[in-house]
């Protein structure tokens, strides 16, 4: 009884080994047999008729296995591209991606104001010589209504033509950059660029490139370089400062930080912003009361009956 049981188990092990080898062999043979039979499970029993509008050669060439075979058999190599010939200017895909990320190149009055407010604002500026004046009554040509536009000081600054420019990451410190930027604040753009060209500061070259970039952006908006001046210019930390160990005597160490900064500026026009600021300063001076040596104030305290001199 035990002998027959052992013999049956031995036969079962042999059959499983044979079946597993056959199944593995059949799995490997299946794709080849299907490819030879044109993809039919019945092999040569049925005929694989070509589809209408396509040739047999087109189907074979379009199959994945044939495409791999053609690619492996092809002796021609892809043409090599010279990396030095690719620049930022001639890379069309990169330029399209940069343009898609940027905001549209237009003045703030065209993008922030509604059509009616834009007409009133432009009419107000046209009446007052190019800049906005408070409490000005405006009458549009196609309407009999009269309008008065009220804007805050912040809104007036935003709507006036201006150019915002920012630099790249600069290897310098805020203390060194401030010495140069204080000199350039309030100057005309062209004069500021000349000052940067003749300055011995290392950061002057990056600041000059920033101002030239702002001039180009202003020309796209229709602003003349001779009419631009630096309204605001400042610097700040760009973050991610590099640090390294400073080894000292007697096993002491320190940490040296390498600062990185950025420079940003706002360019405005002399024909609009400076004229408005001069007009507001003139109004403020006219409203100021005249200075007198002894003001007309009530007498405080007890005077007494004795004359005082």
Swiss-Prot record:
Feature: transit peptide: 1-25
GO BP terms, alphabetized: mitochondrial translation; translation
InterPro entries to which the protein is assigned, alphabetical: Ribosomal_uL22, Ribosomal_uL22_bac/org-type, Ribosomal_uL22_sf
Compositionally biased intervals (Basic and acidic residues): 48-59
Example of a GO cellular component annotation carried by this entry: mitochondrion
Intracellular or extracellular location(s): Mitochondrion
Xref: SUPFAM superfamilies: Ribosomal protein L22
Endpoints of the signal sequence: none
Classification via Pfam families: Ribosomal_L22 (PF00237)
Molecular function terms from GO: structural constituent of ribosome
Record's keyword terms, sorted: Mitochondrion, Ribonucleoprotein, Ribosomal protein, Transit peptide
Region (Disordered): 40-63
Note: Present with 1800 molecules/cell in log phase SD medium.
Annotated family: Belongs to the universal ribosomal protein uL22 family.
Subunit structure: Component of the mitochondrial large ribosomal subunit (mt-LSU). Mature yeast 74S mitochondrial ribosomes consist of a small (37S) and a large (54S) subunit. The 37S small subunit contains a 15S ribosomal RNA (15S mt-rRNA) and 34 different proteins. The 54S large subunit contains a 21S rRNA (21S mt-rRNA) and 46 different proteins. uL22m forms the wall of the exit tunnel.
Annotated function: Component of the mitochondrial ribosome (mitoribosome), a dedicated translation machinery responsible for the synthesis of mitochondrial genome-encoded proteins, including at least some of the essential transmembrane subunits of the mitochondrial respiratory chain. The mitoribosomes are attached to the mitochondrial inner membrane and translation products are cotranslationally integrated into the membrane.
Name the UniProt record assigns to this protein: Large ribosomal subunit protein uL22m
């Amino acid at each position: 009884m035990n002998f027959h049981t052992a013999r049956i188990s031995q036969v079962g092990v042999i059959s499983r080994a044979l079946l597993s080898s056959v199944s593995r062999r059949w799995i490997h043979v299946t794709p080849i047999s299907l490819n030879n039979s044109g993809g039919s499970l019945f092999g040569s029993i049925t005929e694989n008729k070509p589809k209408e509008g396509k040739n047999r050669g087109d189907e074979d060439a379009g199959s994945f296995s044939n495409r791999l075979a053609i690619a492996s058999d092809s002796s021609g190599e892809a043409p090599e591209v010279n990396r030095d010939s690719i620049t930022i200017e001639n890379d069309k895909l990169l330029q399209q991606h940069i343009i898609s990320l940027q905001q549209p190149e237009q003045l703030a009055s065209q993008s922030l104001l509604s059509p009616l407010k834009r007409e009133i604002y432009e009419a107000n500026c046209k009446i007052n010589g190019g800049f906005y004046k408070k409490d000005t009554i405006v009458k549009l040509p196609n309407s009999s209504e009269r309008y008065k536009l009220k804007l805050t000081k912040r809104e007036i600054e935003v709507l006036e033509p201006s150019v915002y420019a920012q630099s790249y990451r600069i290897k310098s410190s805020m203390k060194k950059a401030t010495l140069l930027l204080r000199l350039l604040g309030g100057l005309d753009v062209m004069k500021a660029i000349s000052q940067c060209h003749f300055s011995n500061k290392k950061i002057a070259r990056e600041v000059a490139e920033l101002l030239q970039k702002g001039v180009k952006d202003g020309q796209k908006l229709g602003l003349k370089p001779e009419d631009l001046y630096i309204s605001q210019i400042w610097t700040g930390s760009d973050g991610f400062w590099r640090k390294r160990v400073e080894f000292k005597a007697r096993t002491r160490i320190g940490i040296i930080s390498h600062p990185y900064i950025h420079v940003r500026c706002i360019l405005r026009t002399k024909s609009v912003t400076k004229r408005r600021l001069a007009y507001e300063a003139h109004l403020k001076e006219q409203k100021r009361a005249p200075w007198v040596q002894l003001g007309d104030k009530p007498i405080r305290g007890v005077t007494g009956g004795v004359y005082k001199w």
